């Protein structure tokens, strides 16, 4: 409780925080201390999310690709059934009324512009009002990265204009601007 008054809340992030079976107890303890609780998740374990959602104040939900394209989604995540797990988690969050943002870390080799726009249209159709586009960047200090650097031309100015028009709250996070 030494931090009370210094902190407004605690955000559970990771990796993927929902893989930790201790997460529900940790969230309850933080909530019992009077802090707001945020969660960063890709939604890969809907059952654990469902258990803690009543205690969560805000969710940053990572969406990797259009969830309607399960093959692409699974390829981007490297895990089978990840699109269906994401969709289940997305529906749980929507139904809960908890504030959330959807965000995508994008690289043109995995999410070409046409797929990025397909994803954005899906989010729009689902009523998402806050979308953050995070352009992939190499990890700081990394000597090797599995992906080449992303140029400032991704996404195009036209695509950027569409994205800004789709969402009341559109955020672009990148290092080259």
Tell me the role of every PLM-derived stretch.
Residues 15:
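Conserved phosphoryl-transfer catalytic core
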Residues 144-154:
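Short, flexible active-site recognition loops that position polar ligands and cofactors
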Residues 155-177:
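A C-terminal junction/extension of Radical SAM enzymes
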Residues 1-9, 18-145:
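Conserved AdoMet/S-adenosylmethionine-binding subsite of the radical SAM
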């Amino acid at each position: 409780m030494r931090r009370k008054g210094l902190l407004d809340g605690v955000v559970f992030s990771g990796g993927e925080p929902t893989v930790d079976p201790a997460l529900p107890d940790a969230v309850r303890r933080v909530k019992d201390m009077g802090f707001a609780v945020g969660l960063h998740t890709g939604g890969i374990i809907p059952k654990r999310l469902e258990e803690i959602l009543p205690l969560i104040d805000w969710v940053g939900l990572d969406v990797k690709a259009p969830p309607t394209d399960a093959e692409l989604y699974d390829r981007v995540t490297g895990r089978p059934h990840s699109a269906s797990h994401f969709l289940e988690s997305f529906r749980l969050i929507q139904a809960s009324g908890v504030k959330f943002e959807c965000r995508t870390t994008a690289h043109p080799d995995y999410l070409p512009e046409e797929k990025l726009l397909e994803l954005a249209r899906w989010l729009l159709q689902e009523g998402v009002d806050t979308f953050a586009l995070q352009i992939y960047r190499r990890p700081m200090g990394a000597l090797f990265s599995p992906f080449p650097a992303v140029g400032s031309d991704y996404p195009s100015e036209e695509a950027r204009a569409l994205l800004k028009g789709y969402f009341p709250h559109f955020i672009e996070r990148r290092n080259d601007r």
